[in-house]
Structures are given as C-alpha cells and as structure tokens.
Regions:
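Acidic, polar-rich low-complexity tracts and alpha-helical solenoid repeat scaffolds
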Residues: 2-667, 673-675, 679-686, 693, ...
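Catalytic and substrate-binding regions of cell-wall glycan-acting enzymes that process beta-1,4-linked
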Residues: 452, 459, 606-609, 617, ...
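Active-site metal-coordination segments of metallo-dependent hydrolases
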Residues: 571, 644-650, 714-724, 776-778
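Acidic/histidine metal-binding catalytic segments
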Residues: 664-671, 738-745
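Peptidoglycan-targeting cell-wall enzymes and recognition modules
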Residues: 677-723
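An active-site-proximal "capping" alpha-helix that borders the catalytic cofactor pocket
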Residues: 726-730
Length: 800
C-alpha cells in the first residue's frame, strides 16, 4: 500500500520546482527588460549622465557608466574617444595596467588624442621604473608630435629619462631640440657635458646660461656646474664672479653655497666695496636657516665695521631679533634700547618699540611691557609709535584678564588715525571694532557686544571682510549661551520679521539689510532659504547689484558622434580641445583651447580655464569684474557658472586625491593656492618659492622625506599635482599642531616658529587672540585674504 507521506512529499517537490522555474523566468524577464531599458537610452542621454558625473567629479560613477557604454555600443565608445576618458580615470586610481590597454587603443587607431595617450603611457612606464619603455614611447611622441602642446614637456621628460639611465649623449641631443632661449635646458646640457668629462664645453655652456644676469633656476644650475669645474681645476674666482655666484645662491636660498662665495670676497678682496653687503647677507642666511647665534655674530660684525651704512644699521637692529628668537629676552631688550639711542631717526624706530614690548611680553614681564607701552604712547611726534603703544597695552591687558582696561584702549584707538605708514603691521579699524565687541563679550555685556558684532557687515575682502565673518561666527557661538542665546534669538527673529515686512512693502534696501543680518545667525534650512530668496529678490531690483554681463559661449562639441557620422581625424589644437572638453577633461582641454583663435576672447575661455589648468587666466580676467560688485554681494547667490569664473575650482582630481585623505579641506588648500600664485603653477617668487603652492627648498626637502620620495628635485614643484601633494602634506602637519585655519594660514606664510611665538604671547588658544598677535604685516594680510577666499569657496561649493 503506497505511503501517503511519500506522495505528499512528491507534490511539495513538484511545487517547489515550479516556483523556482517561475522565479528564474521572472528574473530573466527582469534582466531582459533592464537590458532593453538601458539599450533604449540614447547615446546622447548616456553622455549627459556621464558629463554630469564628470562635472561633479564623481569618477567612480563616470567609470561605471563608461564600462556600461562599452557593452552597449563598442563602436560609439571608440568613435567618441570614451576609451581615452576611461583610461584617464583608471590612471587616476592607479590602475596603470588596465589604463594602458585603453590608451593603446587610442594610439593604434590614430585618434586626435593619440599624442596625449602616448604621454600617459610614458607616465605609466615611468611609474614602474621602466625607463627604456618610457624612452621608446616619448621618442615616438617627439618624432610624431609636430606642434603638440606637450612636445616641449616630452622633450624635457625624455632627456631626464636619459639622464637617469646614464645616456648623456642622448640627453644632449634631445635637449638641443628645445629653443636656445630655454636656459634651463642649456644648463642641463652643461650638466650632461660635465658628466661626460667634456669640461671646457660644459664651462662655455654654463657661462651661456648665466649670460643674461638672471637669478633663476637656470642660473642656479649653471653656478653649481661652474663650481664643480672650478673645484676640480683649482680656479680662483674674481671678486665680480664670487659676488655673482653668491647672489644667485642667496636668492635661491642655497645659503651654505652663498656663504662660501661671500667669504671668498671677504677673504680675498679686503678693499672691496661690497664687504658690508657680504657680511650682512651671511648674517641673513644664518638667520633664515634659524642659526641665530651665528647670525648675531655677523650682524654685529657688519655694524662694528660699517656702522653708518644701511647694512650696519639693520645688522645692529636684527641682533635683537636673534636674541628674541633664542629666548634671551634681556639681551634682546638691551639691544632694542641701544638701537633707539644710536639710531633715533631710523625707519625702524617704531618697530624697535614694538619688538621691545613683544619681547617683554614673551618674558611675562607685563609691568615692564606696560611701562614701554606708556613710553611709546608719550612719543607724540611719532604717530606710529603712539598707536602701537595703545594696541600693545590693549593686548597686555587681555593677557592679564583685564578686559575693562583693554576695552578702554581699543576705544581710544577708534579715534586715532590708523592709516599712518606702517600701521598695517599692527592693527586696523575693523580689527579695533571687533576687539571692542570681543572685550564686551568677555565682560558679559552681551547686549552691547551683539550690537557691535552686528555693526561689522559681512563683506568679501580685506580686514573688514575677515572681521565681518568672524563677528557672525561669534554671534552664532553666543547663540549657544544660556543667557546670551536669548538675546541672540531676539535679534535674529527681529531681523527675520523685518525682512518679511520689507518685502511685503517693497522696501528693497530694507529687505537687503534685514535679510543679510538674519543670515548671520544660526537658522534652520527653511528660514535660511527664505532669507536668501528675499535677498535675491532685493538684488534683482537694486541697480548696483546687477551682475556684469558675462556671455559664456559653448566651446567644443556637445553631442556624441552617432554611427552615421565620421569622427574628426585631424590633430589641430581646435579638434583636440573639442574632444577633450567634450569628455569633461578640462585639465588638458583648456590649455589646448588657449592655442586656438577663441583664446582671444576672455569670456569664451574663462569657464574652461576655471575648471582646467589655466585658472590663472580666468582670475586675471574676473577679478576686476568681481571688484565691480558691491562688497556685501553674497557669493552663494551668484549663478554657478559666474561663481566658477569669480572663484575657480581647478585641480579637482589632485585635491581629491591628496588633500581630502589627509584631512585638509580641498577648499582651504585651494584658497592657499589662490593667494600664493593665483593658480599659476610655474610661479617662482622673490623668496625662491616654487610652483603652485610656493615651497622653498628646505621645506620641500622635509616634505619629500616624509613622503618617501627619493628622486625628488626642486623643479618637480612646478608640476601642479606634486605641488598639491606637498601642500596637502604640509597643511596636514600644520593642522595637527595648530588646529585652526587661521593658524595654518599664518604658519604657511610666516613660519611655524612665528605662530608658536604669537600663541605663547597671547597666552590663549582663542583664534581671535592669535590673529591680533600677528606682528608681520604681510602675514596678517595673508590670513585675511586666505580666510576670505575660504569663506567664499565654502559658500559656493558647500560639498566637495
């Protein structure tokens, strides 16, 4: 008799099998429908999604879309050079082998982008240390490149590769392809000749590189080469030659080599008229190398031997700085006191008072510092000294916790002329107004403090712009106080009500004023959006708030090439620019565009350059337009394309790759770069700082060691990606020590030691106490500018 349980089991198995079959069928149907949906998307639609991902720098999404496009339409993928874009994205994430396969496809079909593909294949080979392969690829590029934009760079890179493998004759032949005007190439030819022991040829080549009297990188290489030759041959330098080489080394901060040549002048030419200069520069070199003991010796010597010269006067003064830097407070004070007696009419008279007071403050001798401050205030014949004395006393009182006396001094400063020569080294009107509010806040006089903070409007530039934004930040902080928060909320709500009422009445100026003030407080997103709408409405009705007319034409093609069309095959700059910009590769497309007739139009190239590697051109064009706008025009209300021109965001890939992983906000790094060089990657300053992020040699060498870069050369800093890597690492170090953006900006410009000294002098980590302690005019102005840029970038690009 059959088992009923077995029958039931068979029925269940059949049912389960049927259910599985149904699920498989449904799944296949879903897949087919999904595939059909993807195929139904037009090439134009897929390209639009791809460009949107590229424009927001979502490289992961862009790569995913590109891989889907390979499957959907491989012919269109090649026809539109999407394989080149995919290769670039793969190279960015260090997938060099796979990137190479796609670059090779571009080369093999002789695409207009074949030259760029060869360049990147050579980069991949170089990263692997495969120099023979790199040389083969670059040699092919140079032989086929014609007037390619990368041709000279390829020649330089090929010569460098030959240097690394010891093929100096090939390096010379390669460098000779460059114009004679490229003096760095000339100096490198001399180095290759010297390596081949063609000494006299090398000497003539180095002399030719030095002939125009410049102090630049080419001259530095030439001097180093000549010194190697002279050391081997025992050549004795003339006075003029010793001074020439010393000047080149000193400018480039090669202080050891500079000192050696200054000593030749001092030891061999006792009657030289340049002896005072040589002594002073030796002292300066030691000082900038932080060897303050040796610096003081040389500064004293130049004063002792040449007291009535400019070098003697400055040397006597700078000895005080040496003692101050060594923490030898009493000797520093004695030197400043002696300087005031010996040089009562010196341009440094007021600064000697300032430094004497600062030294006493560092020594925590506050009563003596107050006595010096009073002495400075009594010098009615020198307005700078009087104002400096008042400002110093205010800072001392704050350090002592006596905010009432500090408030009195800041109040006295309000009635003073703060525009006397040199006063930007100490303080300014917005700073004085802000510090009055700060003191009122510390005294618990919140009502008055809030009013004074509100009296400092949010502006874009200068000390006024910086302190307006700092006032808003203090207001938001006060909103969290149990007592002051009630007062803050009352003011905020009043401004919101006023803005709404003014809009209802059509009172445009009142709308603008009230909405601007309301936005300074912490509000919810709904209220903030409402106030911005009111402000936008006010701008539209105020003649002074109309944006300058910026017509941004389309450049490059915008539509993908369909199957029936023939892709472009020529390698003109116009075609290459069009293909690169079509792919969203502004870093290469914008410089190509500058080689076309359209480059004559600042309007046409402003947006591509803002996104690419020529943002310095955009800034040069846009800064006058930005200055034509009212100072209180809020950056976040600019249309995005206009905002990008006023505040470009170039080098997104490098910033995302190097800054963000190190905990550095890319927008802050960008603000530093803007202030340092206006985004010019080839910049070299009078302080011999190189590249986009302006590194001097000593700091660059320290960062290279941290990063484990063994083959680093100073010229590498002219590569924007390398500069951003170094800048990001350096800023990471600074943030780890100092914390605040203001302190990091001050360190970047004025040195870590200076910031440590200013923080110690303030006796407080409060950022507002630090900023008023910044004693260097250039550094304080630098902080204002960087933070103002940072505020604008945060407003325009709320996420990175």
């Amino acid at each position: 008799m059959p088992n009923p349980l077995r029958k039931i089991f068979r029925i269940e198995v059949v049912c389960v099998a049927a259910l599985i079959a149904l699920l498989i069928f449904a799944g296949s149907l879903f897949i087919q429908r999904s595939r059909s949906s993807a195929e139904a998307q037009t090439l134009q639609e897929r390209h639009a999604r791809l460009r949107a991902a590229m424009d927001r720098n979502d490289q992961s999404e862009a790569e995913s879309l590109l891989r889907g496009m390979i499957t959907n339409d491989p012919d269109a993928f090649a026809r539109n050079n999407y394989d080149y874009l995919l290769a670039r994205l793969l190279q960015n994430r260090r997938a060099g082998a796979e990137a190479g396969t796609f670059f090779l496809r571009v080369v093999n079909r002789n695409s207009p982008l074949a030259g760029y593909a060869l360049w990147h294949l050579a980069e991949i080979a170089r990263d692997r240390g495969a120099y023979p392969e790199e040389q083969k690829l670059l040699g092919k590029f140079v032989s086929q490149s014609g007037d390619h934009l990368l041709r000279d760079r390829a020649i330089e890179r090929l010569a460098d590769s030959y240097f690394k493998t010891g093929h100096y004759h090939y390096a010379i032949d390669t460098l000779q392809l460059l114009p004679r005007s490229r003096r760095v190439a000339l100096a490198k030819i001399g180095e290759a000749q010297l390596a081949m022991r063609r000494t006299e040829e090398a000497r003539r080549t180095f002399e030719a590189a030095l002939a125009n009297g410049s102090l630049d990188d080419a001259s530095l290489r030439a001097c180093a080469g000549l010194d190697r030759i002279d050391a081997a041959t025992g050549t004795v330098l003339t006075e003029a030659e010793a001074l020439r080489r010393a000047s080149v080394y000193q400018f480039n901060r090669s202080f050891t080599e500079a000192r050696r040549h200054y000593l030749i002048l001092l030891n061999n030419f006792p009657q030289s008229r340049k002896r005072a200069e040589a002594m002073f520069q030796i002292g300066r070199g030691y000082f900038l190398d932080n060897d303050f003991v040796e610096a003081a010796k040389w500064y004293d010597r130049v004063h002792d031997e040449y007291p009535r010269t400019e070098e003697g006067e400055q040397g006597f003064y700078y000895v005080g700085h040496c003692h101050q830097s060594l923490g030898d407070w009493m000797r520093a004070i004695a030197r400043y006191e002696a300087f005031l007696k010996e040089y009562p009419n010196s341009d440094y008279f007021g600064y000697a008072h300032l430094n004497a007071i600062d030294t006493l403050r560092s020594a925590r001798r506050f009563e003596d510092a107050l006595a010096w401050a009073a002495r400075a205030q009594s010098n009615g014949n020198n307005p700078f000294t009087v104002v400096n004395g008042l400002f110093q006393e205010a800072k001392i009182r704050m350090t002592q916790g006596d905010y009432a006396e500090a408030l009195a001094r800041f109040t006295a400063l309000r009635s003073r002329n703060l525009n006397v020569r040199g006063l930007t080294a100490t303080t300014n009107a917005p700073e004085v107004a802000f510090m009055r509010a700060y003191c009122l806040e510390q005294l618990g006089r919140f009502d008055e403090a809030i009013d004074e903070y509100l009296a400092l409007p949010e502006l874009r530039e200068g000390a006024a712009g910086y302190y307006g934004h700092r006032a808003s930040e203090r207001l938001r902080d006060l909103g969290g106080d149990s007592y002051a928060g009630v007062l803050v909320a009352t003011r905020r709500d009043a401004f919101i009500t006023q803005a709404r009422a003014a809009r209802a009445q059509g009172a445009v100026e009142a709308m603008k004023s009230a909405a601007n003030q309301a936005l300074r407080f912490a509000t919810g997103a709904t209220i903030r959006d409402e106030m911005l709408r009111i402000l936008r409405d006010a701008y539209s009705r105020l003649p002074g708030y109309q944006l300058p007319k910026i017509s941004i034409p389309e450049v490059g093609r915008t539509a993908p090439i369909e199957s029936a069309a023939t892709p472009p095959s020529d390698d003109s700059h116009q075609t290459i620019a069009g293909e690169l910009l079509f792919l969203g590769l502004y870093d290469e497309g914008a410089p190509e565009l500058l080689q076309t007739p359209i480059a004559k139009s600042d309007y046409a190239i402003s947006l591509p350059c803002a996104r690419g590697g020529c943002a310095s051109r955009t800034v040069k064009f846009s800064e006058p337009l930005l200055r034509s706008l009212p100072e209180d025009y809020r950056p976040e209300l600019l249309p995005l394309e206009v905002a990008e021109i006023f505040y470009p965001f170039p080098y997104r890939d490098s910033l995302a790759r190097h800054a963000a992983p190190r905990g550095v906000d890319p927008r802050f790094a960008l603000s530093i770069a803007r202030q340092e060089t206006r985004y010019n990657p080839r910049e070299k300053s009078v302080s011999a700082a190189r590249g986009l992020m302006q590194f001097i040699a000593s700091t660059a060498n320290q960062i290279a060691a941290q990063l484990g870069l063994r083959d680093f050369e100073q010229d590498d800093l002219y590569n924007p990606d390398t500069a951003i890597l170094f800048g990001s690492q350096y800023m990471k170090n600074l943030f780890a020590e100092f914390g605040s953006s203001q302190a990091v900006a001050a360190s970047y410009n004025g040195s870590e030691d200076s910031v440590r000294r200013w923080i110690a002098r303030a006796g407080d980590n409060d950022v507002d106490r630090l900023v008023i302690e910044i004693a260097k005019r250039e550094t304080k102005d630098y902080v204002f500018k960087v933070i103002n840029f940072y505020n604008a970038y945060q407003a325009i690009y709320p996420s990175t």
